[in-house]
Amino acid sequence: MGSNGFLLQEETKRIDERLSLLKAESQWNNLKLFLVKMSKKYYNESFFLTELSNVCTKLEQLEEAYEYSRKAFELNSADYLVKYNYIFALLNLDRLDEAFVIIKQIKRVSTIHIAYSKSGEGLKWAKSIKNDTKYLEGVYYLKKGLLAKAQKCFTLHLRNRRRGIYSDFTKRQVLKKINECLHHPKPWG
């Protein structure tokens, strides 16, 4: 184990292989157990907490997902992946105003800044974070009942999609959200 609860470079390959295998086999409960163990061993690494949040979301354990995401954010609030995942967890619990504060933080910075920040992983990764944050902004507006703003965000997300740029959201999901904006029942009728 690295000093002070940090992961050492030579340990990452073994851990990455284990994570990839468990994800590929959709062994979400085993993956959760593995990540809990890693988060205790490497208690200063926000990565494991962020991954735990994602797994808990998959398992529909939204309160737990939020707790892991919050802890990751407390450890490393400058990491844009941590911020993005925290937004996701907050929106899942309808903590809309808290989520919007972080959405605005990501919107304010350039893609280049995100790409080459301390925890940045390059331009494609940063474009993915920025565009998927636009989708989450749409979710925020949809939950607030601001349908025109929500539709605009989802449409921009769709327009900004590019081959080779990963998204957490399928095109089908985005189109469904746009349709939801168009056919959302009016609060007065």
Give the label of every model feature segment.
Residues 8-41, 47, 51-54:
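Alpha-helical segment of the N-proximal tetratricopeptide repeat
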Residues 17, 51, 85, 129-136, ...:
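"A position-specific structural signal for the A-helix of alpha-solenoid helical repeats
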Residues 39-40, 70-74, 104-108, 159:
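Conserved structural position within tetratricopeptide repeats
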